């Protein structure tokens, strides 16, 4: 089974993906590292630009029939059996990205993406089985336990549980207006 863990930068993808893979006994794959290793994409202005179609094809070929947790904000473009879209309060994302040294424009772009569900919408356009999980105020262990419970119960689709419209005013200073 291929489980893709995706979300806006700063939601906890890597932490959750590694823990989920460990709990399930699955292989963990960081998509950025995988793309670099396979020569998929190129560096442009200090960012790796990845050809999503090439990534999807190579990943599908290399991991077909394997149990894998794929970690990356492009993982929802893979042919996955299940896509987990991690969400977090946009203000929390802003704080985390600021700590990581993100510039104002990139920070604003990602806060806005979380605020208006960009990753979730993309995931739903690409996949049938999408589960949305709000990580706000939860430990990584709690998030993984929630995911495992949903998987055990056979839940393949759970979306629409997050609405950040009430925090819009709080994140306004971070947005690129």
Swiss-Prot record:
ATP binds at residues 10, 12-15, 100, 138. It is an enzyme of class 2 (transferase). Residues 99-109 are annotated as: LID. Residues 30-50 are annotated as: NMP. The keyword Kinase applies. InterPro entries: Adenyl_kinase_AK6 (IPR020618), P-loop_NTPase (IPR027417). Keywords: ATP-binding, Kinase, Nucleotide-binding, Ribosome biogenesis, rRNA processing, Transferase. It catalyses: AMP + ATP = 2 ADP; ATP + H2O = ADP + phosphate + H(+). One of its GO terms (molecular function) is adenylate kinase activity. It comes from the Archaea. One of its GO terms (biological process) is ribosomal small subunit biogenesis. Its EC number is 2.7.4.3. Gene3D superfamilies: P-loop containing nucleotide triphosphate hydrolases. The keyword ATP-binding applies. Transmembrane segments: none annotated. Belongs to the adenylate kinase family. AK6 subfamily. Interacts with uS11. Not a structural component of 40S pre-ribosomes, but transiently interacts with them by binding to uS11. Broad-specificity nucleoside monophosphate (NMP) kinase that catalyzes the reversible transfer of the terminal phosphate group between nucleoside triphosphates and monophosphates. Also has ATPase activity. Involved in the late maturation steps of the 30S ribosomal particles, specifically 16S rRNA maturation. While NMP activity is not required for ribosome maturation, ATPase activity is. Associates transiently with small ribosomal subunit protein uS11. ATP hydrolysis breaks the interaction with uS11. This is Putative adenylate kinase. The lineage of its organism: Archaea, Methanobacteriati, Methanobacteriota, Thermococci, Thermococcales.
């Amino acid at each position: 089974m291929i489980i893709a863990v995706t979300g806006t930068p700063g939601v906890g993808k890597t932490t959750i993906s590694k823990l989920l893979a460990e709990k399930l006994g699955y292989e963990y794959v960081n998509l950025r590292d995988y793309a670099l290793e396979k020569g998929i994409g190129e560096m442009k202005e200090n960012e790796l630009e990845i050809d999503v179609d090439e990534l999807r094809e190579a990943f599908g070929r290399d991991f077909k029939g394997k149990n894998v947790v794929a970690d990356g904000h492009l993982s929802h473009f893979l042919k996955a059996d299940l896509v987990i879209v991690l969400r977090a309060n946009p203000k929390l994302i802003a704080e985390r990205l600021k700590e990581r040294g993100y510039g104002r424009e990139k920070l604003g772009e990602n806060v806005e993406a979380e605020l208006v569900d960009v990753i979730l919408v993309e995931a739903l356009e690409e996949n049938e089985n999408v589960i949305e999980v709000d990580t706000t105020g939860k430990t990584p262990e709690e998030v993984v336990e929630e995911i495992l419970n949903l998987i055990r119960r056979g839940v393949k689709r759970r979306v629409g549980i997050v609405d950040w419209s009430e925090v819009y005013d709080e994140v306004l200073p971070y947005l690129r207006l």
